[in-house]
């Protein structure tokens, strides 16, 4: 495991899923809640490390983080003859924090949406395409309350380097991103 991701997690969670099919329509949804602790994180005070690497904020102290996560998703599909259309959306939010120095407060939001269509091309295959959109943001605020001094905060840029200009006690970062994409799929299906 990566030191930046920590050495363990203790999480309680609730996960509720539903699927309803009525006639040619299908409807599904999910709601999830997690609460717990991420242990032993070092050189990283930023949430979603694997998504944001190498542009993360870190320090030499690190430690355990309390985490609370929410996730909601849902979708709808409709089949008419050999054609199927559908849409799905999801939103995830996370807060990570620590009550001892260094004290990060990370708030994330991740919105994702997909639409797609497929049609049966013969007796054994379906051809489909889809479009995807994602919007992500994170507010990262790192504070110290120790009056005796604070360690340097590093704004890493990858390959062991950091923004020297921002090194010190400045512990605020804001991440914002968007992505768009698409896919084409050829899938076998049982014609029976």
Task: Walk through the language-model features, giving the residues of each.
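Outer-envelope beta-barrel architecture signal
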Residues: 23-29, 81-87, 123-127, 189-191
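Extracellular loop and loop/strand-boundary signature of outer-membrane beta-barrel proteins
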Residues: 2-4, 56-62, 97-103, 167-172
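Residues on the lipid-exposed face of transmembrane beta-strands in outer-membrane beta-barrel proteins
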Residues: 14-20, 72-78, 113-119, 182-188
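Long, internal scaffold/assembly segments composed of regular secondary structure
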Residues: 166-192
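Residues that define the transmembrane beta-barrel architecture of outer-membrane proteins
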Residues: 8-14, 66-72, 105-113, 176-182
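Outer-membrane beta-barrel translocator domains and adjoining extracellular loop/strand segments
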Residues: 2-6, 40-46, 97-105, 140-146
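Short, flexible helix-coil linker/hinge segments at the edges of structured domains or between repeats
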Residues: 43-56, 130-176
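Transmembrane beta-strands of outer-membrane beta-barrel pores
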Residues: 1, 33-37, 78-80, 91-95, ...
């Amino acid at each position: 495991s990566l030191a930046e991701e920590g050495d363990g997690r203790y999480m309680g969670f609730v996960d509720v899923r539903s699927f309803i099919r009525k006639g040619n329509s299908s409807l599904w949804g999910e709601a999830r809640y997690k609460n717990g602790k991420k242990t032993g994180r070092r050189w990283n005070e930023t949430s979603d490390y694997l998504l944001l690497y190498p542009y993360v904020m870190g320090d030499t102290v690190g430690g355990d983080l309390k985490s609370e996560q929410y996730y909601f998703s849902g979708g709808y599909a409709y089949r008419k003859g050999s054609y199927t259309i559908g849409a799905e959306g999801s939103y995830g939010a996370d807060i990570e924090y620590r009550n001892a120095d260094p004290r990060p407060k990370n708030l994330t939001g991740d919105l994702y949406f997909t639409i797609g269509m497929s049609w049966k091309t013969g007796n054994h295959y379906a051809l489909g395409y889809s479009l995807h959109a994602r919007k992500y943001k994170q507010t990262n605020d790192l504070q110290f309350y120790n009056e005796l001094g604070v360690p340097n905060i590093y704004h890493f840029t990858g390959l062991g380097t950091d923004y020297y200009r921002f090194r010190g006690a400045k512990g605020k970062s804001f991440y914002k991103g968007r992505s768009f994409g698409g896919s084409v799929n050829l899938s076998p299906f049982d014609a029976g």
